[in-house]
């Protein structure tokens, strides 16, 4: 990709558990993403997330101009005062300039901070940066919040991996509502670690959701872990197929509920969103 795009600025947002089937480990993912740093060499610029432990380890190999961004650790482009509004969208200060986002989720606050940082590296005016980020909206099926008849649906079903699942669950916890419902499916391309990674997500669901509905072979591990973490059989349910799960949620939704819908793209969870919003 570097040879095709020929970037002059490279950005490392995070290094996580996506595509482990192909890279085998987080270290393998780090090695692949680190190829961007190798390409940049000594004459080009790397912008990296100072709050991501694996990224920080990986950037030790960079030889060129290294710039950092983040909300927690000291960095050249440090976001301050991060708060989320009623839609879960981040508002923060960067070098005392207010940034307001229309994309929900704490993880997207990092994306917004990185984008603003790149703008400043390229000498874009603050007003232009603020306007552009305030106007940018999520694309379909990526942290897309839809409201209908008192129901809030977080449509995040374009794809899923363990890190994005955890980020979506955090968003579910941040959006106000009467009941928090996680409607989740399999995360694919995780290789031999798939069972353990689904279980880790299930344990987190128990801390963020009132109800877990799941379907898919691997999601049985997710439901089992949620039950082990404290959810009972009425709170954490597994369904044999998507249609049965869709029928259940359609019959049991209430005004004020917040429903997160997320799975790997091949699970076709967009069908669930369509059913919920009918």
Task: Please report, for each region that a protein language model flagged, where it lies by residue.
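Active-site beta-alpha connecting loops in nucleotide-dependent enzymes
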Residues: 139, 157, 161-231
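Short amphipathic alpha-helix with an adjacent loop that forms part of the alpha/beta core around
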Residues: 245-252
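Short acidic-hydrophobic, aromatic-tinged amphipathic segments that line or gate anion-handling sites
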Residues: 235-245
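Short beta-strands and strand-loop turn motifs
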Residues: 11-17, 49, 155, 181-186, ...
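Glycine/threonine-rich flexible loop motifs
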Residues: 20-27, 165, 191-194, 269-271
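Acidic, Mg2+-coordinating active-site environments of NTP-dependent enzymes
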Residues: 2, 6-152, 177-178, 203, ...
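Short, glycine/acidic-enriched loop or turn micro-motifs at the edges of active sites
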Residues: 17, 52, 158-160, 189, ...
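ATP-dependent carboxylate/acyl-activation modules
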Residues: 140-142, 266-274
């Amino acid at each position: 990709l570097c040879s095709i795009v020929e970037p002059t600025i490279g950005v490392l947002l995070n290094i996580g558990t996506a595509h482990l089937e192909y890279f085998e480990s987080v270290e393998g993912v780090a090695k692949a993403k680190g190829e961007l740093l190798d390409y940049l060499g000594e004459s080009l610029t790397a912008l990296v997330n100072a709050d991501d432990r694996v990224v920080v380890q990986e950037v030790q190999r960079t030889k060129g101009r290294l710039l950092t961004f983040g909300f927690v650790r000291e960095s050249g482009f440090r976001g301050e005062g991060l708060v989320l509004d009623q839609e879960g969208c981040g508002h923060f200060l960067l070098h005392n300039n207010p940034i307001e986002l229309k994309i929900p989720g704490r993880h997207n606050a990092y994306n917004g901070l990185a984008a603003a940082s790149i703008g400043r590296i390229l000498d874009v005016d603050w007003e232009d940066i603020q306007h552009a980020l305030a106007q940018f909206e999520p694309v379909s099926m990526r942290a897309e919040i839809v409201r209908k008849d008192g129901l809030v649906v977080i449509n995040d079903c374009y794809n899923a991996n363990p890190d994005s699942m955890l980020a979506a669950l955090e968003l579910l916890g941040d959006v106000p509502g009467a009941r928090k419902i996680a409607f989740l499916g399999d995360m694919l391309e995780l290789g031999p670690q798939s069972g353990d990674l689904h279980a880790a997500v299930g344990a987190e669901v128990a801390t963020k959701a009132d109800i877990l509905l799941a379907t898919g072979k691997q999601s049985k591990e997710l439901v089992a872990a949620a039950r082990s973490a404290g959810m009972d059989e009425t709170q954490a349910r597994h369904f044999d197929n998507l249609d049965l799960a869709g029928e259940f949620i359609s019959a049991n939704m209430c005004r004020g509920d917040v429903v997160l819908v997320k799975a790997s793209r091949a699970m076709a969870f967009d069908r669930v969103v369509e059913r919920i919003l009918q």
